[in-house]
């Protein structure tokens, strides 16, 4: 049951990092620091990367025309098999870097796993596997599977035995359990990827799992690691897995604000939050909204209250069975519901393209969690709005930490907000 314990740990985000110092100056060639103004769209197109026609067709189907800054910097080297260590803001398309780079290079061999991608939560693993399916749409010979705790390991073992995937996405606990049961063979892995790598490498037990898995893969392979937050303490740990990696840090790490995202706070008592939330949902224009709360109980109660007030809400929290969480996540992603109430479980790495407003109904516990929550709105260079409720001195302190660390001014919510500042106008 050891892997179950690891999996359960993955569900909560204990964001206890120290505020990050500006980027270290230790030389580690080749390194790219992409600073200056935040330009999310480059004039070059995906065609410039000379990708397979099947990939280009899938990219067109997804509606992407130009690579983001991080894609522009990473993809040309990544598709050549170079090791990559990349830190870039949430919502800038890091996932597509390793999905496209690995699919570009993959030469599927029946019965062999070529690509191993690991991340720290089940939901993120599920989402990454969906991205692989989306981009490999015109590559029918490429098989993708996702493995994580909370679901029957027997089913996973059957999949590996009867229909061995070329791309495996999963959480470290379940991957290690499958390796130990001799169901998963990693001897042919050519690409080893960690997404939100800091989350896995900061927790010592999870780092041990990752290291054990890493040692079971061939010495000659490509290693890529990505995260929105990479403290200077964790970077040397990442480098130990790599050989002369290309390091890409998009923008200064203290300035992890998101282009196009309007950020405001509202000062009020805890007892006034519901009324204020309902008022704002009435007056603001939104495609989809995520409301973050601090506990399962508050999540369930608020979702119920919203439904009673005729707001189409759905809840996701860590008290739910795994299948139920994934089903609800998919419902929200498919636009069946427009309002999602969630705990931190949902806060990191989740990608819902239509979300343009995030509410911190309860203040996140620290500045990192704040970043990963508000990054749900305004992803991939689009506009968005983040509203944070401040109800006591501790809330105010955390908001000050956010402003100091990310060098951003979070102003008090004005009486009226120009709709064009937080929602894309249809052309």
UniProtKB/Swiss-Prot annotation:
ATP binds at residues 88-95. Its main location: nucleus. The modification N6-acetyllysine is found at residue 35. Transmembrane segments: none annotated. One of its GO terms (molecular function) is identical protein binding. It catalyses: ATP + H2O = ADP + phosphate + H(+). Residues 1-19 have a biased composition (Acidic residues). Residues 75-248 form the Helicase ATP-binding domain. GO terms for cellular component: cytoplasm; nuclear speck. It is an enzyme of class 3 (hydrolase). Residues 260-421 form the Helicase C-terminal domain. InterPro entries: DEAD/DEAH_box_helicase_dom, Helicase_ATP-bd, Helicase_C-like, P-loop_NTPase, RNA_helicase_DEAD_Q_motif. SMART domains: DEXDc, HELICc. SUMOylated by RANBP2; SUMOylation modification affects its ability to bind RNA. A motif (Q motif) lies at residues 44-72. A motif (DECD box) lies at residues 195-198. Disulfide bonds: none annotated. Helicase that plays an essential role in mRNA export and is involved in multiple steps in RNA metabolism including alternative splicing. Regulates nuclear mRNA export to the cytoplasm through association with ECD. Also involved in spliceosomal uridine-rich small nuclear RNA (U snRNA) export by stimulating the RNA binding of adapter PHAX. Plays a role in the negative regulation of type I IFN production by increasing the nuclear retention of antiviral transcripts and thus reducing their protein expression. This is ATP-dependent RNA helicase DDX39A. It comes from Mus musculus (Mouse). The gene is Ddx39a.
